Regions:
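Short solvent-exposed loop/turn micro-motifs enriched in small/polar/acidic residues
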Residues: 4-7, 227, 235-238
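N- or domain-start disorder-to-order transition segments that initiate the globular core
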Residues: 1-31
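Charge-rich, well-structured scaffold segments of protease-associated domains
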Residues: 8-10, 14, 25, 69-225, ...
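Histidine-centered active-site/metal-ligand motif
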Residues: 54, 58, 202, 252
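A domain-level signal for the structural core that forms small-molecule/cofactor-binding pockets
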Residues: 255
Length: 421
């Protein structure tokens, strides 16, 4: 078992062939955020099993070998803490936020959820209905649904384009055997990352994890398990437009293109460009589309970085009668940025804005926990905040021009509409 100090208050321990543990001590708070990331999610699903990772994430809360669903709910909430989970494209995560004195209880509950769910057929029928209602909620929320459609258009035949929730048909067909097979295949220490941030030392975290049997070496023999491999991502569909009809007050439009993976250093240039393009009230899109033309209330740029690929784009909601005008104006702004990039004072201001946002985003233990876990689950070596700030500061005009020309080219964008005909 090897422990490395990554920064003044940040440490990482890697068990040979086993779990990765990271922590950041924040002595000024009285709480700890702690989570377990399972490196298996929708990117690992074949189409017929779409949604199985998300359904399993729900089902572990229905009961374990030691706790009922109500006992799980009360275990931390009764102490003022919180317990939650989510499924992304790359990982399934379970996390808690508790008083520092309640960290042993939090780790016990999280371990119980990940290791010992009972996965009963009777619970599946109930929770299946809950997930079907979650799908209904997305379909009743057009500014969510349009993003689902955008991903499907980018990757129509790959799991990155599948709905994380699944479809009504796939969720309805999933069985407890499907859930148990996924749990046995993916939910084991060598496929997990554990991260904590707050008023806890790394030594204390390791002590508690040792008590929960997280620090043993990898299983051997017939029971040995290997982490499931994600399905390789094919090239995204670029430069196409898809229009979907729905009776809505607004037309919802997403521009999107594949970009760079989490570990790609070009992500810093993309973050800076996205900020300038649609990151706030001072951004080009906000000023042009909302302030100058009055075409939208919501207009913003977005970036997401996954283990294998990223997505960069723009969302706007506008009246059906102004949708064509809004799309044309956004394309004009894309063309300007792709052609000119960022230079001089504009680049200096954009760097300062991005650096400030990065620092402000880490003001809570939960945010620090998520950041720590992000490195191993996405395959990037640890980068200190100072290193990230330096990477942003070091961006050159040439780098910005290259990234802008490649990823903000209007001809590259896939555009998806959702609204009235």
């Amino acid at each position: 078992m090897e422990t490395v100090r990554l920064d003044r208050e940040i440490s990482q321990t890697t068990v040979p062939g086993g779990v990765v543990v990271l922590s950041e001590r924040v002595p000024s708070v009285r709480s700890v955020a702690v989570g377990i990331w399972v490196r298996s999610a929708s990117a690992h699903e074949p189409r017929p099993k779409m949604g199985v990772s998300h359904l399993l994430e729900h089902m572990v809360f229905k009961g374990t070998e030691r706790r009922t669903a109500q006992q799980i709910a009360l275990a931390l909430e009764s102490r003022g803490g919180s317990l939650d989970a989510y499924t992304s494209r790359d990982t399934t995560a379970f996390q808690a936020r508790v008083l520092d004195s309640d960290l042993p209880q939090a780790l016990d509950v999280l371990t119980d959820l990940v290791r010992n769910p009972v996965l009963r057929p009777s619970d599946l029928e109930l929770e299946r209905n809950v997930v079907l209602e979650e799908i209904n909620t997305v379909e009743d929320t057009p500014d969510d649904q349009v993003f689902e459609l955008a991903y499907q258009t980018l990757w129509p035949k790959h799991s990155y384009g599948y709905s994380i929730l699944g479809t009504r048909d796939t969720v309805s067909a999933l069985s407890t055997d499907d859930l148990k097979q996924l749990h046995g295949r993916a939910y084991f220490p060598a496929n997990c990352v554990i991260a904590a941030a707050g008023n806890v030392t790394h030594e204390r975290l390791l002590e508690l994890l040792g008590e929960q049997a997280w620090l043993a070496d990898r299983e051997t023999g017939k029971g040995k398990r290997e982490a499931p491999a994600a399905i390789p991502v094919p090239a995204a569909v670029r430069g196409t437009e898809a229009r979907h009809t729905k009776d809505t007050a607004q037309t919802h439009i997403v521009f999107a293109t594949d970009s760079v993976a989490y570990a790609d250093r070009r992500k810093y240039a993309l973050l800076v460009l996205a900020n300038v393009f649609g990151g706030g009230m001072s951004s080009r899109l906000f000023q042009r589309i909302r302030e100058e033309l009055g075409l939208a209330y919501a207009i913003y740029a977005f970036t997401s970085f996954y283990r294998q690929v990223g997505v960069t784009g723009v969302y706007v909601g506008t009246q059906p009668k102004t949708a064509v005008q809004a799309e044309a104006a956004i394309r004009e702004e894309y063309a300007k940025l792709a052609r000119a990039g960022l230079a001089g004072e504009a680049l200096a201001e954009a760097k300062q804005q991005t650096q400030g946002q990065l620092m402000l985003s880490l003001e809570s233990p939960s945010a620090r926990m998520y950041r720590l876990a992000g490195f191993p689950v996405h395959g990037e070596p640890y980068q200190s905040l100072d290193q990230v700030l330096a990477a942003v500061a070091g961006l050159t005009e040439e780098e910005m021009a290259t990234v802008a020309a490649e990823f903000f080219d209007p001809a590259r964008q896939t555009v998806v509409w959702l609204g009235k005909e």
